[in-house]
């Protein structure tokens, strides 16, 4: 894999000011040793989201069994399951005064249930402690197992999301252990068995063509996916898949308009957009 010598030379539209008004959530998450993808993923929108009372929590540890070339989460042998985690997450969301929580996780292919039971218990614990909180669950693919997907659906989060991440041609390179059609079918199945809002996300700048992006939008909409996010890929390190191109803002706007014309209920498209950006807005759509 080639190293991108220009990885540190980002265009001006990708530069953001250092966050300075999210101390409360930051301190609590550090004190309680909570895994937030906001921090571990170095999200550029961390201050904006946390100030709005929105945060993304990662369950089932911080070591993933998969080795996606775009992702900054550690790969290896995960730790043992913390069966108290659902209650811990729920309690801390309450004291943080979170209004809308996004729950995600590492892949746990080492477990028979791939972590689905902890997933279900976490959703239930959060809802039990605060009925008014809204939830988005950004789930792994569970290798397409419907019995495991059903566990999530049965707890009725407001939004269930699963990211396709990239176009079909690049999936094997970027998401080594994932499958493009499997990801599409996970979301398609959720829509077939429920009225829960579905969502996906893709990254640009990996070497995809315009035609491939548009086809991915079509594939997503054909699966009745309601919401899509489109953002610029930024390589976590020189060991990861390198950025082939920084996409200018007007191209993101173009894709936003195309996606809306296809019938998506909501589209977030821009260089700094990440999967959970403006997530709280997605529950108020008609």
From Swiss-Prot:
Does the record bear Nuclease in its keywords? no
Cofactor binding note: Binds 2 [4Fe-4S] clusters per subunit. One cluster is coordinated with 3 cysteines and an exchangeable S-adenosyl-L-methionine.
Asked if the Swiss-Prot or TrEMBL record annotates the protein with the keyword Lyase, the reply is no
EC number annotated for this UniProt entry? 2.8.1.8
Which organism's genome codes for this protein?
Answer: Karelsulcia muelleri (strain GWSS) (Sulcia muelleri)
SMART domains given for it?
Elp3
| Name by which UniProt lists this protein | Lipoyl synthase
Any one Gene Ontology cellular component term annotated for this protein: cytoplasm
Give cofactor(s), names only: [4Fe-4S] cluster
**PANTHER family, per the entry:** LIPOYL SYNTHASE, LIPOYL SYNTHASE, MITOCHONDRIAL
Its localization reads:
Cytoplasm
Give the main location: cytoplasm
Q: Which molecular-function annotations from GO does this UniProt entry contain?
A: 4 iron, 4 sulfur cluster binding; lipoate synthase activity; metal ion binding
User: What Pfam families is this protein classified in?
Assistant: Radical_SAM
- What's this protein's family per the entry? Belongs to the radical SAM superfamily. Lipoyl synthase family.
Catalyzed reactions: [[Fe-S] cluster scaffold protein carrying a second [4Fe-4S](2+) cluster] + N(6)-octanoyl-L-lysyl-[protein] + 2 oxidized [2Fe-2S]-[ferredoxin] + 2 S-adenosyl-L-methionine + 4 H(+) = [[Fe-S] cluster scaffold protein] + N(6)-[(R)-dihydrolipoyl]-L-lysyl-[protein] + 4 Fe(3+) + 2 hydrogen sulfide + 2 5'-deoxyadenosine + 2 L-methionine + 2 reduced [2Fe-2S]-[ferredoxin]
Which keywords annotate this record?
Answer: 4Fe-4S, Cytoplasm, Iron, Iron-sulfur, Metal-binding, S-adenosyl-L-methionine, Transferase
**Which top-rank group of organisms is this from?**
Bacteria
**Pathway note:** Protein modification; protein lipoylation via endogenous pathway; protein N(6)-(lipoyl)lysine from octanoyl-[acyl-carrier-protein]: step 2/2
**Stretches assigned to the Radical SAM core domain:** 50-265
